[in-house]
Amino acid sequence: METEAIENIPRVCLPQIGAPAPDFKANSTFGPIKLSDYRGKWVVLFSHPGDFTPVCTTEFIAFTQVYTSFVERNVQLIGLSVDSNPSHLAWVENIYKTTGVEIPFPIIEDKDMRIAKLYGMISPAETSTSAVRAVFIIDDKQILRLILYYPLEIGRNIQEIIRIIDALQTVDKYKVLAPANWYPGMPVIVPPPKTYPELKQRLKNVEGYTCTDWYLCYKKV
């Protein structure tokens, strides 16, 4: 019986990491927007379950408090929920009136859940049609680089999102790998050899590297 119940849950099609991010047009608190208009910038597209909810409110305040950190990294923040634009506007105004925080980025209206379904933000296992708490990081070439999902009860760690962007931009720029718990300024991993001749060459030339073994070498960037 339990197996049958699981099998009856509809499958959610998610966009794939490394593939082009699905384009969309939408109305927002900043007017009409189109994802492809942000080509050349990184995008953090994040969904929230609903306006006027406590955890989401703390997240939007937290995003705003470090908004300049995203701007410095050439990142555009875009929020989304299945609420209406009037609801978004009322919520944003309420946040400003009660906390003095003015939300500086657009929030998408997705009443028909078109974008939420396109990005797999609606969980078929939930009884609510609210969008799950998700994060999609899209690079300046409109390639989807990362997907994060959070339970409805737990707010996002905004500093971790910034750390991930730093890591992605660093590995792109220097063609390296980021180790566990990496932060800017720490050593990065040199990609390991892919062939035996490359392995032999690595063993001969480790100048500038700190190596544990041939497949794990670090360097500063």
From Swiss-Prot:
Q: Any keyword Protease?
A: no
Q: Which residues form the Thioredoxin domain?
A: 15-170
* GO BP terms in the entry: cell redox homeostasis; cellular response to stress; hydrogen peroxide catabolic process; response to oxidative stress
Where found, per UniProt? Cytoplasm
Which GO molecular function annotation, any one, does this entry have?
thioredoxin peroxidase activity
Q: Which GO terms describe its cellular component?
A: cytosol
Q: Which residues does the Swiss-Prot or TrEMBL record annotate as the active site?
A: 56
**EC number(s) per entry:** 1.11.1.24
Does the keyword Disulfide bond feature in the UniProt annotation?
yes
Residues engaged in binding substrate: 133
UniProt xrefs under CDD domains: PRX_1cys
The protein's UniProt keywords, in alphabetical order, are: Antioxidant, Cytoplasm, Disulfide bond, Oxidoreductase, Peroxidase, Redox-active center
Among the Pfam families in the record, one is: AhpC-TSA
Please give the chief subcellular localization of this protein. Answer: cytoplasm
List, alphabetically, the InterPro entries matched.
AhpC/TSA, Peroxiredoxin, Peroxiredoxin_AhpC-typ, Peroxiredoxin_C, Peroxiredoxin_TDXH, PRX_1cys, Thioredoxin-like_sf, Thioredoxin_domain
Catalysed reaction per UniProt? a hydroperoxide + [thioredoxin]-dithiol = an alcohol + [thioredoxin]-disulfide + H2O
- List cystine links: 211-217
Question: Which family, according to UniProt?
Answer: Belongs to the peroxiredoxin family. Prx6 subfamily.
Q: Which HAMAP family match?
A: Peroxiredoxin
Give the protein's biological function: Thiol-specific peroxidase that catalyzes the reduction of hydrogen peroxide and organic hydroperoxides to water and alcohols, respectively. Plays a role in cell protection against oxidative stress by detoxifying peroxides.
Read off the PANTHER family from this record. THIOREDOXIN PEROXIDASE, THIOREDOXIN-DEPENDENT PEROXIDE REDUCTASE, MITOCHONDRIAL
**What other remark does the UniProt record contain for this protein?**
The active site is a conserved redox-active cysteine residue, the peroxidatic cysteine (C(P)), which makes the nucleophilic attack on the peroxide substrate. The peroxide oxidizes the C(P)-SH to cysteine sulfenic acid (C(P)-SOH), which then reacts with another cysteine residue, the resolving cysteine (C(R)), to form a disulfide bridge. The disulfide is subsequently reduced by an appropriate electron donor to complete the catalytic cycle.
This protein's assembly is summarised as: Homodecamer. Pentamer of dimers that assemble into a ring structure.
Query: Which NCBIfam families does the annotation name?
Result: PRK13189.1
What is the protein's given name?
Peroxiredoxin 2
Give the species this sequence originates from.
Answer: Caldanaerobacter subterraneus subsp. tengcongensis (strain DSM 15242 / JCM 11007 / NBRC 100824 / MB4) (Thermoanaerobacter tengcongensis)
